[in-house]
């Protein structure tokens, strides 16, 4: 890297700061960019610039958006009675790709993890409290995963909601054996939850 021209070296250093890109991968990417027409590299530069200047968090749900409130929050076809809690924006994107959920969202901005210094005040619980105070939410769906941190977060939020809004139903995503899997390959906890939450045929 010492013999690289300064502009190339500077770009490689910046690219290698991205997750999953080491110096060699960053150099390959930079060399690819050098082969692009100048108009394309300028377009890429503008897109990166616009990303920082034009994106912000939706004041209602916490999603990344270029308008506030976001398109999901303002969509009249979505039910305001169901509020799905997710830890991060990528979980919202995954649920949206499925096309089966027609309620609204709230992004918590993480999960409770005291060992990592992530406590309740680190989460978007004020935003949740405001949404609940509006009085339209009838069900809160916890779509947080099954890690210890997710379980702790779900329990904490459930207790908070039940205490303040006992009429609101609190649910979680079903857990169990994934589609296409065999029982003999499942871990004990997955089997336990599958048995506990079994369904009628």
Curated annotation (Swiss-Prot):
Keyword Zinc: yes
Ranges that cross the membrane: none
Alphabetically ordered keywords of this record: DNA damage, DNA recombination, DNA repair, Metal-binding, Zinc, Zinc-finger
Gene3D superfamilies membership: 3.30.60.80, 3.40.1360.10, RecR Domain 1 (1.10.8.420)
Origin: domain of life: Bacteria
One GO process term, biological-process aspect: DNA repair
GO molecular function, one term: DNA binding
Domain Toprim as annotated: residue spans: 81-178
A Pfam family: RecR_C
Coiled coil: none
ZnF endpoints (C4-type): 58-73
Family per record: Belongs to the RecR family.
HAMAP family assigned to the protein according to its UniProt record, in alphabetical order: RecR (MF_00017)
Function, as annotated: May play a role in DNA repair. It seems to be involved in an RecBC-independent recombinational process of DNA repair. It may act with RecF and RecO.
Protein's UniProt name: Recombination protein RecR
Gene: recR
């Amino acid at each position: 890297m010492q013999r690289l021209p300064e502009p190339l070296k500077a770009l490689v250093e910046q690219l290698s700061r991205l997750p999953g890109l080491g110096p060699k991968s960053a150099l390959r990417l930079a060399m690819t960019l050098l082969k692009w027409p100048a108009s394309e590299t300028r377009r890429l530069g503008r897109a990166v610039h616009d990303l920082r200047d034009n994106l912000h968090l939706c004041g209602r749900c916490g999603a990344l958006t270029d308008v506030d409130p976001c398109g999901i929050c303002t969509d009249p076809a979505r039910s305001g009675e169901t509020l799905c809690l997710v830890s991060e924006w990528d979980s919202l994107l995954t649920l949206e790709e499925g096309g089966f959920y027609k309620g609204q969202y709230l992004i918590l901005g993480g999960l409770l993890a005291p060992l990592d210094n992530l406590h309740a005040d680190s989460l978007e619980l004020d935003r949740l409290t405001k949404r609940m105070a509006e009085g339209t939410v009838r069900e809160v769906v916890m779509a947080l995963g099954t890690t210890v941190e997710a379980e702790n977060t779900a329990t904490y939020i459930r207790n908070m909601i039940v205490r303040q809004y006992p009429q609101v139903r609190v649910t979680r995503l079903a857990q169990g054996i994934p589609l296409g899997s065999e029982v003999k390959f499942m871990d004990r906890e997955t089997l336990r939850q599958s048995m506990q939450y079994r369904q009628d045929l």
